[in-house]
A protein has these predicted regions:
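ATP-binding N-terminal substructure of ATP-dependent carboxylate-amine bond-forming enzymes
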Residues: 1-98, 130
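Active-site nucleotide/adenylate-binding loops and adjacent lid/helix of ATP-dependent enzymes
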Residues: 7-8, 102-148
């Protein structure tokens, strides 16, 4: 007997796959996706919502009487959405904002790896164009540049 209402946050392929898996679960009666995409609209109810807006997400989850909220993208996790849901007594699948920093900030992840002596590629955090240019000259190609 299906009885669960699930809210999936996000609009990408990962969230589509998560929502579809929930839709196929016989324990799930209703799947909602915020904001969703045209693909998720074929089997779930999409809600136009900024998934990084903690108050809006909590309000929607309460309004839907969601039994579970699944947070797909890293941006809402880093913004503290999972924390806000848990603080409101709503079950949530997703790490805390603090734990999400490992995925959300490459610089933070590099600091953690260095502190734990985990082997990783050399890196440099830069705050302006001059320091980026100096780092590129120092490392030489090939290199990877990421925005944090």
């Amino acid at each position: 007997m299906s009885s669960m209402t699930v809210l999936v946050l996000g609009s990408g392929g990962r969230e589509h796959a998560l929502a579809l898996a929930c839709h196929r679960d016989p324990e799930v009666a209703a799947v909602h996706v915020a904001p969703g995409n045209p693909g998720t609209a074929s089997f779930a109810t999409n809600h136009p919502l900024d998934p990084c807006d903690c108050d809006a997400v909590v309000s929607l989850a309460r309004g839907l009487e969601a039994d579970l909220v699944v947070v797909g993208p890293e941006a809402p996790l880093v913004a503290g959405v999972a924390d806000a849901l848990r603080e409101s007594g709503i079950d949530c699948f997703g790490p805390s904002a603090e734990a999400a920093q490992l995925e959300g900030s490459k610089a933070f992840a590099k600091e953690v790896m260095a502190a734990a002596r985990v082997p990783t590629a050399a890196s440099r955090s830069c705050d302006d164009a001059n320091s980026v240019s100096a780092a590129l000259d120092e490392f030489g190609p090939p290199y990877v540049v990421k925005d944090d």
